[in-house]
């Protein structure tokens, strides 16, 4: 695995995969899936004063936030902490 450590006020997020079927059971083709803006925090930068999330948090982030990066064929984002709009509690 690549070891990516975000710098300063940045956060590395693993993007939650879009659902592959609807509530009624219909399968959604790959090209028709909506891109989600929910993910799990994988790593945080060193500027702890500006970062209010921690590793393992599920977060909602701005739709066009961050820079996309693939790690082990999974979609991730590196974005600024201020682009995270909410923590999702389950």
UniProtKB/Swiss-Prot annotation:
Q: Which residues form the signal peptide?
A: none
Q: Which InterPro entries match?
A: Chaperonin_GroES, Chaperonin_GroES_sf, Chaprnonin_Cpn10_CS, GroES-like_sf
Q: What is this protein called?
A: Co-chaperonin GroES
High-level lineage: Bacteria, Pseudomonadati, Spirochaetota, Spirochaetia, Spirochaetales
Under the subunit heading, UniProt states: Heptamer of 7 subunits arranged in a ring. Interacts with the chaperonin GroEL.
Q: Which GO terms describe its cellular component?
A: cytosol; membrane
Main function: Together with the chaperonin GroEL, plays an essential role in assisting protein folding. The GroEL-GroES system forms a nano-cage that allows encapsulation of the non-native substrate proteins and provides a physical environment optimized to promote and accelerate protein folding. GroES binds to the apical surface of the GroEL ring, thereby capping the opening of the GroEL channel.
Molecular function per GO: ATP binding; metal ion binding; protein folding chaperone; protein-folding chaperone binding; unfolded protein binding
Q: Name its GO BP terms in alphabetical order.
A: chaperone cofactor-dependent protein refolding
Q: Which gene codes for it? A: groES
- On whether Cell cycle is a keyword of this UniProt record, the answer is no
Which Pfam families does the entry link to? Cpn10
Record localization: Cytoplasm
Keywords from UniProt, A to Z, are:
Chaperone, Cytoplasm
What's the superkingdom here?
A: Bacteria
Report the family membership: Belongs to the GroES chaperonin family.
């Amino acid at each position: 695995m690549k070891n990516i450590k975000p710098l300063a006020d940045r956060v590395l997020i693993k993007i939650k995969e879009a659902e592959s079927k609807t509530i009624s059971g219909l399968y959604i083709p790959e090209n028709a899936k909506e891109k989600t803006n929910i993910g799990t925090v994988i790593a945080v930068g060193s500027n702890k004063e500006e970062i209010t999330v921690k590793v393992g948090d599920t977060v909602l982030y701005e739709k066009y936030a961050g820079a996309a990066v693939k790690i082990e064929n999974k979609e991730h984002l590196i974005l600024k902490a201020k682009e995270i709009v909410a923590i999702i509690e389950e």
